């Protein structure tokens, strides 16, 4: 297995690729503000190339765009935004036979269910559960054990609209829907995940691109850029495309606080994940 290559700048390799799948949280922003170097890098990518923002946000892309506008990240920086929420909606609309669901998550994610012909109901009347995250950003996982036990007792299938386990909002760590779903699985519950790192998320993205641009997608020309080994990089591995690992994102504390050499950390992780390129932060 080849060792990962450190990039002093994206400009060293960007000519090899035509499509860039760029993660948002941890690469473009930290939940509060954008990273200036990341914006400069995206600005420098030629217009003939495509920048596709992909996110495990459990909401439709138009809802995420409103948040991006608030942190001054507008549409001129990219061609398309696709979320795990978009794929979840596609599944619920086209493949879900059951119509009554229980929503396990905050009200801010309710846009996920608009115009799907589904009925939000109590747990007692639900046919399945859709999990979008914790109700309060400060919640611990233990708070959800009682409701998960009730869901398991009814033997309901859970749809997880965000496979991420945690996220860093500024300097604070918060649990995501993926952590609740994993806890439910440990109880013996059945979960279907939508988003990174699952192959069908990338297949869905490529189908959207093919329809929009009316041409076949060459996977050899795709570069995935992300900071999460378990979702972004593993997802690139699953889809068999090249990747650029941003080590200064969600995994930063694993090497930075331990005074571990970045290159040694990445090489060690390369035993479990195939990492092609890496940077501390996305830099042109």
Language model segments and positions:
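Substrate-engagement module of ASCE P-loop NTPases
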Residues: 45-47
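Polytopic endomembrane small-metabolite transporters, centered on the Drug/Metabolite Transporter
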Residues: 83-85
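N-terminal phosphate-binding loop and flanking beta/alpha elements of the actin-like ATPase fold
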Residues: 50
């Amino acid at each position: 297995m080849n060792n990962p290559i450190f990039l002093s700048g994206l400009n060293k390799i960007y000519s090899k690729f035509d499509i860039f799948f760029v993660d948002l949280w941890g690469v473009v922003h930290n939940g509060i503000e954008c990273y200036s170097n990341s914006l400069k890098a995206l600005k420098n990518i030629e217009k003939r190339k495509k920048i596709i923002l992909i996110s495990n946000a459990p909401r439709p892309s138009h809802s995420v765009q409103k948040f991006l506008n608030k942190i001054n990240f507008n549409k001129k920086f990219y061609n398309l935004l696709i979320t795990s929420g978009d794929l979840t909606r596609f599944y619920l609309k086209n493949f879900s036979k059951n119509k009554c669901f229980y929503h396990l998550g905050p009200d801010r994610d309710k846009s996920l269910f608009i115009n799907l012909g589904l009925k939000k109901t109590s747990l007692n009347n639900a046919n399945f559960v859709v999990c979008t995250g914790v109700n309060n950003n400060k919640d611990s996982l233990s708070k959800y054990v009682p409701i998960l036990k009730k869901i398991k007792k009814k033997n309901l299938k859970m749809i997880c609209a965000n496979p991420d386990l945690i996220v860093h909002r500024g300097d604070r760590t918060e649990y995501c829907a993926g952590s609740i779903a994993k806890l439910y699985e440990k109880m013996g519950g059945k979960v279907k995940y939508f988003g990174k790192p699952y192959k069908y998320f990338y297949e869905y993205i490529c189908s959207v691109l093919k329809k929009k641009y009316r041409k076949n997608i060459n996977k050899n020309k795709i570069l995935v850029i992300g900071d999460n080994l378990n979702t972004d990089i593993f997802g690139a591995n699953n889809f068999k495309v090249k990747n650029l690992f941003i080590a200064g994102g969600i995994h930063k504390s694993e090497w930075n606080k331990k005074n571990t050499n970045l290159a040694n950390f990445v090489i060690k992780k390369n035993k479990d994940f195939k990492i092609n390129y890496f940077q501390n932060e996305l830099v042109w």
